[in-house]
Amino acid sequence: MIIGIIGGGASGMAAAIAAAQWECNEVILFERQARLGRKLQATGNGRCNLSNLNMDLQHYHGDAPAFAAPALDRFGVEETLHWFRDLGLCTVCETTGRVYPYSDQANSVVDVLRFALERPNITLVTGSEVTKVKRMDSGFQVDCEGFSYSGDKLI
């Protein structure tokens, strides 16, 4: 199965890593910037707050808690920290419950994610903006400046 993912930020990189764990999948990650995770490097004043030990539905302040509930139930704090540990990232928890990389630098998070993307079944398309997405009978087509990609699923 060919899975396309538009956006090379934290969510896009995580989705690509997760999808590529099944080696039968081919993953194409599209990012218009030349480098992946650029905004991630600036989060948390350059420290990158990964999670919070107090993360649960009681602390959700959005308009649709029913929408957030399945995600929080399925991939909570422990699962998040375990996922980052499996990628090789050490973390530290502050007394406030905030979780940061042990290095206290967002670059550590970006580096770990980029390293995890270095798999034979992941293709990175960077520095090229997606100009058109077209739904096809058998999946999708993504047009980038001068290139066209087809696949089965699109995130």
What role is predicted for each listed range?
Residues 68-76, 95-115, 125:
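Short beta-strand to alpha-helix junction loop
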Residues 107-108, 112-155:
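Predominantly flavin-linked oxidoreductase catalytic cores and closely associated redox partners
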Residues 12-14, 36-39:
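Short N-terminal binding/cap micro-motifs at the start of the first secondary-structure element
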Residues 2-29:
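N-terminal Rossmann-like FAD-binding beta1-loop-alpha1 element of flavoenzymes
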Residues 1, 24-25, 140, 152:
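Nucleotide donor/acceptor-binding cores
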Residues 45-95:
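Glycine-rich active-site loop/strand segments that organize a redox cofactor
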